[in-house]
A protein has these predicted regions:
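Short, structured helix-loop boundary elements
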Residues: 2, 42-45
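Short, well-ordered alpha-helical segments enriched in acidic and aromatic residues
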Residues: 4, 16-31
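Generic hydrophobic alpha-helical segments
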Residues: 7-8
């Protein structure tokens, strides 16, 4: 489990979407929850790939770092430190060059030796 998550995070940090999806189940479910609100969700590896590619242009740099990792049955929970620099002014009020340092957690579920569900919570 940990090696799949490490690979996913490493590829995310390198902005390599194809490699990021290499360890993901074809029927993967993804949700991003911010302040208790689901602001993005996908169903299937194709949709997740589209969202990941669209997100590449949001940040000129980005990095997720795993601060802790715990396995609970088929669920892995990672505490994440996120650092990014906004690439351009965004509709939500973030400005080009603004630095983001956030913390949150990512929950990963697994099926057939692959990541089958990802929930990012901040």
């Amino acid at each position: 489990m940990r090696s799949l998550v490490d690979h996913y995070i490493d590829a995310y940090n390198r902005m390599d979407v194809d490699d990021m999806l290499a360890g993901v189940h074809p029927d993967v479910e993804f949700r991003n929850i911010s302040a208790g609100v689901v602001n993005a969700s996908t169903s299937g590896v194709v949709e997740l790939g589209k969202l990941a590619r669209q997100s590449l242009s949001l940040f000129s740099e980005r990095c997720q770092r795993i601060e802790s990792f715990e396995v609970q049955g088929t669920l892995a929970v990672a505490s994440i430190a996120f650092h990014a620099v906004v690439a351009g002014d965004l509709p939500n009020g973030l400005k080009k060059g603004q630095v983001l340092n956030l913390s949150g957690r990512s929950e990963f579920e697994f099926r057939d030796g692959a990541i089958s569900r990802i929930t990012d919570i901040s």
